[in-house]
Each structure stands twice: as structure tokens, then as C-alpha cells.
Amino acid sequence: MKKTLRFILLAAAATLFAACGGPAANTGANNANTNTTKPVAPTADALMALDKQANEAYVKGDSKFFEGMLSDKFVILTGGGQRMDKAATVKMIASVKCDIKSMDLTEPAMSMIDVDTYALSYKATWDGTCNGPDGKPMKVPSPVRSASIWVRSGDKWQAVFHGENLIVDPKNPPKAAPAAPPKKEEPKKDDKTAANSNTAANTAAPAKATPDANTDALVKVELALWEAWKAHDAKKLDALMAKDVSFVNIFGTYLATRADALKDWTGAGCDVKSVSVTDGFASALSPTVEMLTRKGTADGTCGGQNVGGTVIWGVSIYVKDGDAWKFAFGMNSPAM
């Protein structure tokens, strides 16, 4: 369902948009306080314009364009749950080859996480092909629901996450693609050749990213959220959610508001018996905003479809509210 992730990465753009205000001049003789200008909030149209520029750069395989507009904390999740950081993403884009006849980006919707962090969701409709994992042209799945998380970095906006789900009818999902044939094993090199070979396998591996200290705490909150969803417990969900919430589910449905999410999660759409949340990896976007990537499973039915054993990869954005972490944004994607 999510093969689009390999060859359509609608990330972010480096265009300057809004600046953090510096201290305002204090000209009042009797005013001893120094005032500061509040950071300028973006608009959905402004962030949509940045994503459009990124789309145009992506289909050209213009990887250099993305080097300055992806945050150093940028991550996407592959269909197998692998975290791809900024370096891996830029490298992947460099190999992209597309033949796009048209693209249409519509339905932009923005949700505030905090004054320096925003979620943007939109619908993308494509007509064309891009090279698949085997290098052969594949029709771009369409339409998809895309989501990007933007953070303010000095005087520009950068992306820290991007994801997309094929928009499908839960009651009539597309048929699963046939399984790929098993790969043939290549003859192994002899020990001497392998030891002397100057290959990537013999070069120093890049430093491995490590989750931050809040990971375990955030996984516990995430699990509590899933358990409250399973139980249709509106009171518990309400206590775990931030003031502003948005969410993209596995069917490409966008829940634009807190009220939408509460209504959907407590409705009769899903009948789930058990849930799990594992493989958590948290990274701080700021002292009060955390991004958690995780693996979830649910045993039951949703939208009339059996989801037992289905692996769901996703990202959640949490904001600090006093001593508690509250859910502000999430995107769940079915494993490929």
C-alpha cells in the first residue's frame, strides 16, 4: 500500500519564510521592561508553497536542493520501518529518475504544535512514473495523503519528518502486490579477497544514531494512547492529548482537529482486542517537543478489515505540558 515512499519523497524547502523576532526597542522612559516580538506564524499556503518547490526538486533528482532545507534531525520511515536520516535521504534523492506529466497538490491543512513547530498535511495527485527499487519505471501511486513536520531554524523553516499514505477506501482496499521472487545468492569471495577488498563493507561505518533519554517515557505514553483507543476511552484520550492535535491514519484519512481525532478514535470504526508499541526511538526537536518513531500492532478489525498481526510504523510528536508529555501529531503507515 505504501510503495510511494521509495520514489516520492515530498519533503521540505529551504525558502526563507518567517523570522524569529528580536527584542523590540524600549523607548519609553518610564518602561523598564524589554519586550520581544512574538515569532511570526506561517500559513498553510506558505508551507504548501515550500512543499511544492520540494516536489519539483525531487522529481528532477536535485539532491543538492535538499541539503539545506532538511533539518539535521530529519527522518523518514521506509515501509519496513527503517529510519532514514538526512544523509541517507539526500543520497536516495540523487538516484531518482521520474517522468511526471502532472502533479496536483490540494487540501493543505496546518496544525500548530508549538510556536516553532508545525504539521502540514495535503493531498497529492500524480500522473507519471518514477524509478522503483529495481531501477525500472513504476507508476506513481495516487492519490496520497502527505504530511510534513516543519521547524523554525533561525530565519528559515526546515523539515524534520515527511510521510505519505495511499488514500484508500477502508472497505475496499487495493489488492496486495505479488511477492517478489527470492534473490539468488551470489558466490562468496574467498577470505583473502574479502580481506583485501577495498569496499564499503571494509570502511568505517558512520556513527549510529541513538535515542534520547525520554524514549522509554514516550513509549509508555504512546502505549497508553493506543490502549485508550482500543477501549474507546474518551476521558483517557482527552488527558493524553495536547491542545491542538492532527493525525493521518493508515487509510490516508486526515483528522484535522482534536475533536475529529476524539470522535474517530472513540467511534465504532475499530474493534480491537489487543495492542502493542515497541521499537521506540525519540529525538528532541526542542526542550519541549519530542519526535517518537515507533512500531505498533493491533489485533482486531478496523473499517471492516482484519488488522490482526498488521505491523504499523509511525511517528508521533509530543509536547511538554508541565511534567507530562502530550500527543500533538501522529501518522500511522502500514508496513510494506
Residue ranges, per PLM feature:
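A beta-strand edge to alpha-helix "cap/lid" segment located at domain peripheries
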Residues: G21-G68, V75-K236, S246-M336
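Short, linear, compositionally biased motifs with a strong N-terminal bias
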Residues: A11-A14
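C-terminal motif of bacterial Sec signal peptides marking the signal peptidase cleavage site
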Residues: L16-A19
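Bacterial N-terminal signal peptides that target proteins for export
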Residues: M1-L9
